[in-house]
């Protein structure tokens, strides 16, 4: 694991959480994958990979954490094309232009239909905390 765009920050107050206390805090915010109608999800995962359960890795007083974000990729052009097709068909069927609220309802219906089939993209952000010197690297 290498940091790609390393940002280092200094704490303004002493960092007083130990690994166990931090683990308890993060446990309620553990990562869960996107459901069928979720657009994105964020949470904490084990920094050492899938073989471990600990959300905080401690070594020589240093702490390592990993945040994971999952997003569903639904190109707006696909939604727009489907919306245009449905609007065109309904306008031809009803013989009138659809109102803005009707178009928005159609768009929501299309999103509900497409979200379960959308591809997902994952990203991970590692945090290294040096409590003794008061640094956090992201």
State the predicted function of each range.
Residues 7-9, 64-66, 134-138:
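Short cationic amphipathic helices and targeting signals
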């Amino acid at each position: 694991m290498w940091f790609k765009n390393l940002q280092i920050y200094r704490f303004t107050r002493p960092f007083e959480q130990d690994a166990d206390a931090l683990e308890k805090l993060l446990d309620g915010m553990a990562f869960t994958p996107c459901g069928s109608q979720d657009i994105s999800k964020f949470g904490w995962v084990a920094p050492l990979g899938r073989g471990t359960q600990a959300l905080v890795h401690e070594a020589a007083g240093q702490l390592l954490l990993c945040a994971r974000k999952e997003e569903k990729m639904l190109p707006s052009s696909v939604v727009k094309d489907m919306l245009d097709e449905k609007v065109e068909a309904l306008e031809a069927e009803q013989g009138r232009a659809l109102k803005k609220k009707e178009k928005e309802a159609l768009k929501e219906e299309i999103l509900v239909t497409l979200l379960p089939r959308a591809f997902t993209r994952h990203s991970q952000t590692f945090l290294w905390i040096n409590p003794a010197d008061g640094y956090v690297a992201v």
